[in-house]
Amino acid sequence: MSEAIFQPTDIVLAKVKGFSAWPAMIIPNELIPDNILKTKPVSVHKGKSGSDKKANEDIDADMESEARDREQSEEEEDIEDFGESEANPEKFIIYTPVLKFRKNDTLKSTYCVKFFCDDSYIWVKPMDMKILTSEDCRKWLSGKQRKNKKLIPAYEMAMRGKNGIDIWEFVEYGSYGKPDEEEYVEEEEEENEPEKKAIRPTRSSSRQRQKRASETEKSEGGNSNKRKRVTRSTRQQAIDASEEEEEEEEEKVQEAVRKRPQRTKTKKVVVSKTKPNPKTKAKKEKPKPPKPIKYHFEDDEDWSIVGLGPQDLSIEKTMDPIAKKLSQKKNLEKHVEIKLDLEDKLAGINKLLCDVLCSAINQAVSIKDDFEIILDELQIALDTRGSRNEFITIFQSNNSLLLNFRILFNLRKRELNKWDLWDRFQDIFKHIYSYQFIPDTEDWQLEQNMEIEEMDREKPSFSEDVKEEESKVGA
């Protein structure tokens, strides 16, 4: 709904959660009942953020502005009583020569409204209401949409406009106005009739008793078929009689107090003075203790400390994000599973490197495709290093991988440069160990004599086999 500077006595359409939008009137601060003022919502913000401070400042400003409005209205009333000045129509809504309401200069956080044909008060935010004109009411009543039967009299009353509604009578007696005075007084007198019969004689003068008796005879004689209408004089007589009875009761109480001994008086005074003191002290001596922060076991943030009682959780503020993530059981289980898979994959890469390097030693020419397969496997393994690179330590702690890299770079440097694979292997090495591999100063070469010796060892055995076969044939 629209936000505007609403003024007292404005007719609005207010929306409350769980109910339909209802026509209501904004009640001036001067006419709001005390019990409704006590229910005005004041939100308490415990946080220290800027938005919370701003909200608190807005609430304080609203309270100060309301207090200022009341003081100014009282000052204006005092000035008007003495005849020094008249109310300014720019600052006041002059309802009658006696009744006026101060206008709102700024938008307030809440407004007190009273619903038509419901007579209930509520504090509404400006965003939950909008101005309701007579034309809007006429359109709603003449519309063909389905209507709530309780809303129809409320819209009919709102259609009269704020000038057609007596604000004081609306606040005092409700939507249906002041009740019939004659019926109200007659009921009151009927209720008081048995009380008059039961009243015992008082110490009133003889003239007053004769006067009351003559008046009662006149009232009973004139009301044969229908009860006589109660006038102002009869009501005044009833009030005078009640006042006389109250005065006599007060005299009796004073006489009884005089007859009592002095001790009882002093005791009563002392007791009455000492009673309220401990109550006020008790209220001051009972501050609310701060609520302790307890560990909620159902959160399962750190399942290893379950059963150890309340813990100091302030360490979580400075905890490493990876450690905080692994403190949860499900994340730790997933981490261990990925770690085992990565270790198995590195073991397969090491085996593949050993096979390629050993086969290259026995062969004259290495196969380029084998090294490209190793590069692809290493790249796939590095892709599972984790979002925060937490699995890189598994590569760094694998000594077999480091040894195979050293053999590869020193023994197959010429071939890797020829196939343009040297830089790719160096990039992977730098990604794992944070620096590039520096080959040895002396080039690694295969010992040729080792192959010759192996051939020589095989030849004698072959000749011996031939000789044995020849001897067998000769025999």
Swiss-Prot record:
Query: Has the keyword Nucleus been applied to this entry?
Result: yes
* Stretches with biased composition (Acidic residues): 72-84, 181-193, 241-252
Q: Which GO terms describe its cellular component?
A: Isw1 complex; Isw1b complex
Task: Output the Gene3D superfamilies linked to this UniProt entry.
Answer: 2.30.30.140
Instruction: Reproduce the miscellaneous comment text.
Output: Present with 5820 molecules/cell in log phase SD medium.
Q: Where is this region: Disordered?
A: 42-84, 181-296, 454-475
Any one Gene Ontology BP term: sister chromatid cohesion
Residues that bear Phosphoserine? S2, S65, S73, S242
Bias (Basic residues) = 259-294
Chaperone: present as a keyword of the record?
no
Q: Which organism is it from?
A: Saccharomyces cerevisiae (strain ATCC 204508 / S288c) (Baker's yeast)
Positions carrying Phosphothreonine: T9
Biased composition regions of type Basic and acidic residues, renumbered to the chain: 456-475
Q: Which domain of life is it from?
A: Eukaryota
InterPro entries, alphabetized: IOC4-like_PWWP, PWWP_dom
Keyword annotations from UniProtKB, A to Z:
Nucleus, Phosphoprotein, Transcription, Transcription regulation
Gene name? IOC4
Entry protein name: ISWI one complex protein 4
Subunit relationships: Component of the ISW1B complex, which at least consists of ISW1, IOC2 and IOC4.
Functionally, this protein is described as follows: Functions as a component of the ISW1B complex, which acts in remodeling the chromatin by catalyzing an ATP-dependent alteration in the structure of nucleosomal DNA. The ISW1B complex acts within coding regions to control the amount of RNA polymerase II released into productive elongation and to coordinate elongation with termination and pre-mRNA processing.
Q: Where in the cell is it found?
A: Nucleus
